[in-house]
Amino acid sequence: MRVILQKDVINLGDAGDLKEVADGYARNFLFPKRLAVRANEGNTKAALHQKKLGELKREKRKKAMEDVGGNLNGKEYEILVKTGGGEKLFGAVTPIDVASILKKNGFELDKRKIEIAEPIRNLGSYKIKIRLAEGIQPTITLHVKKEEE
């Protein structure tokens, strides 16, 4: 079945793309979530127009993300955490914690864009990758230090 994507769908395409998908995938997943509509002549013309507008928006968003990425890349941040004696943390530092630190420093990012390679459960310095857009992945350094009581 030919469909026109209304929103970006991971592993399928971007909004405005014309795609061939299985009937069941379209009826059971894409249509109920309003991620796509059935492609017909009228929808196809409208989709081409929408795709052009979407490309302009994506270009603007990519330029904005390049600016943010340039400002973030190589920066160092510090987080104070409680420890259970020695170097072990109570719990772990999560992407939510990193997002809140970045928010305090003027960068509002979704926690899903923050990639922590392995769980941070010890004191020390860690490199954290932030996936802003395709090809834009600044790396920050997070210093995990003991909170003084």
Curated annotation (Swiss-Prot):
Disulfide bonds: none annotated. One of its GO terms (biological process) is translation. PROSITE patterns: RIBOSOMAL_L9 (PS00651). It holds the Pfam family Ribosomal_L9_C. It comes from the Bacteria. One of its GO terms (molecular function) is structural constituent of ribosome. Keywords: Ribonucleoprotein, Ribosomal protein, RNA-binding, rRNA-binding. Coiled coil: none annotated. GO terms for cellular component: ribonucleoprotein complex; ribosome. Belongs to the bacterial ribosomal protein bL9 family. Binds to the 23S rRNA. This is Large ribosomal subunit protein bL9. The lineage of its organism: Bacteria, Pseudomonadati, Spirochaetota, Spirochaetia, Leptospirales. The gene is rplI.
